[in-house]
Amino acid sequence: MPIIEQVGAREILDSRGNPTVEVEVALIDGTFARAAVPSGASTGEHEAVELRDGGDRYGGKGVKKAVEAVLDEIGPAVIGLNADDQRLVDQALVDLDGTPDKSRLGGNSILGVSLAVAKAASESAELPLFRYIGGPNAHILPVPMMNILNGGAHADTGVDIQEFMVAPIGAPSFSEALRWGAEVYHALKAVLKKAGLSTGLGDEGGFAPDVASTTAALDLISQAIEAAGFKPGVDVALALDAAANEFHADGSYTFEGTPRTAAQMTEFYAGLLGSYPVVSIEDPLYENDWDGWAALTAEIGDRVQIVGDDVFVTNPERLEEGIDRGVANALLVKVNQIGTLTETLDAVALAHHSGYRTMISHRSGETEDTIIADLAVAVGSGQIKTGAPARSERVAKYNQLLRIEEALGDAARYAGDLAFPRFVADPK
């Protein structure tokens, strides 16, 4: 049996130069694995709480307390447990913390242990991680939702929409989808240069030009798709992460310099659908605006994927409430929002059972850890969001998916346009 023998932890840096937690787990059979925990820039108020040190060190963002929690309390509690019983291990972590938001021991310390245990168990079983988590039928490669133009909290510009993504829905394989996305990314750089706009990069590797409006950004990306030799909406589609929490205050959305209601924002998004091949819109409204979300879903949810991130925070309880209220039709999956692998898998299972799509996601503060690539294939999400095809912490996930596709061989299937059943390309 793969019994947990040792648990270690350390403070490392993420892609934004901020500290994060790395956990190492050793099993009695000699197996060893490590996992690093990501961190977000725009976070939902209902997420699992990160344990940070405060004070002057690292501007208060140190994680020595979280590391100590692993070494002094969490590690001793899981040593002796069977690593291949993930639910048992994760329940022990949740019970040990004893709070609904993991604020006592920290979601970052708990998640690090949860993921490291899963990795160690897969190594002990001599199985690839995607196969260990997903079982013998895991074979779907996700559409890479590439954030090639950054705004909002990911860039120091006046663009309110946080992420403008390209989705290579027409590609025949993941490897070709990655190539298509990379070629559009490089074409966008040339388009921006020609327009006299900045080609500086945001947190997630996308360009961060200070463009005048959402439609101006979409026009630039559409030009880049065509310049790369592809057809917008047929080969490569568009997707948005509005991250509306960032421009909502006091019941109003201040968007592109104008105060707007939820109904007016819905009208704006509906207008985009009539003009651009948008397959997915994430967090179009404020996380606690349940009524606005329900109305928006009823209005445009039959034409586009509406993804709940901050509104659901990968939490099965909030997702269940959203399903009951008719809110969104897809779930964004971030392992550090809920804090354990088991709870993440439970949220995905609930979404799929309820007819919701899922999109596995990175955070803006990432590491070289590639577990979300394996997770996307394991659960058959058909979609992954892990930044631009640039910056090694983003590319690491794409490269892992290339390895998985190669390992699967003829059994590999690329999700492509089947991942977005609500979208119909303009026949023109």
From Swiss-Prot:
Q: Which reaction does it catalyse?
A: (2R)-2-phosphoglycerate = phosphoenolpyruvate + H2O
Cofactor note, please?
Binds a second Mg(2+) ion via substrate during catalysis.
Spell out the subcellular localization from the entry.
Answer: Cytoplasm; Secreted; Cell surface
| SUPFAM superfamilies named in the record | Enolase C-terminal domain-like (SSF51604), Enolase N-terminal domain-like (SSF54826)
User: Its Gene Ontology biological processes?
Assistant: glycolytic process
Q: Which cofactor does it need?
A: Mg(2+)
Instruction: Quote the protein name from its UniProt record.
Output: Enolase
By which gene is this protein encoded? Answer: eno
